[in-house]
Amino acid sequence: MSKTTVFFSFIILLNFFSLLIFEKHDNLNLTKVIIRPGMNLEEISRELSSKKIVKNSDIFKIWVKLSFQEKKLKYGEFLFEKSNSIYDVTKKLTDGDVVFRKLTIVEGSYKYELLNNLKEIDPNSSLEYDDVSDLIVADTYNYQITDSAKKILHDIRKISNDFSQKIWSEREQTIPLKSI
């Protein structure tokens, strides 16, 4: 075989592979996919293939490995649009472009209500009434579907504490208060 034949064969193979990676795959509608912590590339590719996000799970796996993206894949809930290429899917998974859910704490609500909301999100949670802080700021908080109730409560506590500290540090210093 001549060098020219090998070269053109390589170019054709490269074009074919590029077509598989960058060609848009049409899906009927928006599709949600949940990638759980600890899922490996095989499980992720199977999930994407079963939801018809990628046409061929093997090509997806090959692309992820060849582009050294396997360790960069994030977990969470992803929303895929109607038309995706394997490249687009990989980019979304490595960028961590996840869907955030919202938990709203209304002013004047009880700790018990927050605890019930957290138990609805994570039924396996071992949180109890005393775990919920008395200092929670009424607000809307974001969380991911893969977050545990304990992590969500920790984030709410941190945001509430940071907000309270900010308000305290910006208060009128002449007001005779010693602490929050």
Residue ranges and their predicted role:
Residues 1-180:
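Conserved catalytic or metal-liganding residues and their short signature motifs at active sites
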